[in-house]
Amino acid sequence: PLYSSAASDVYKRQINAFSNANTVVSLANGNLGPSLVKELFKSGEILSLSNDLVKPFYKGRAHQALNWFREALVGVPYRIHQPEGAIFLWLWFEGLPITSQELYERLKRRGVLVVPGHNFFVGMDSEWRHQRECIRISYAQDSESVKKGIALVGEEVRRAFREE
């Protein structure tokens, strides 16, 4: 065999230890970031930065992503929620012949990460098809990566409908 079960146990312990350390580091933020922005909050300048820089930037990115989706999804039944300030879009592919989980798996193999919709319908009727026809996609990465990812989403969704 390529590795023994003893080695496998060592790897499992190492992975578990790394996972635990990552959880602690991710959940316990340091003091540097908060201390740097403390004055921005006290002075109210954080609001002008948000309204004058951050909000317009992501509004432009949202509109660009919407345009790329319009190009990538021609002929595909889809709807996109109205973006209202978040850094992601919700897409609904009505009648998608595969689940959003399968779409996620296909896209992941091609280097594109989306979030399958069913993860956001906790406690809902599991028979409701809509939850398996939606994905959430972020447009916060660099424009070229987002554009490429959107094109690949279009290819995979079109493929799913073709294979139906």
Regions found by a protein language model. Name each.
Residues 97-103, 144-148:
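Short, conserved charged micro-motifs
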Residues 109-110, 124-164:
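PLP-dependent enzyme catalytic core of the Aspartate aminotransferase-like
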Residues 1-7, 11:
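Single conserved hydrophobic/aromatic residue that forms the stacking wall/gate
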Residues 52-66, 78-93, 130:
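Conserved glycine-rich beta-strand-loop-beta hairpin in the small C-terminal domain of fold type I
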Residues 8-9, 90-92, 138-140:
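Short hydrophobic/aromatic beta-strand micro-patches
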Residues 17-25, 43-67, 96:
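Structural signature of PLP-dependent enzymes
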Residues 9, 35-45:
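Helix-loop "lid/cap" segments that line or gate small-molecule binding pockets
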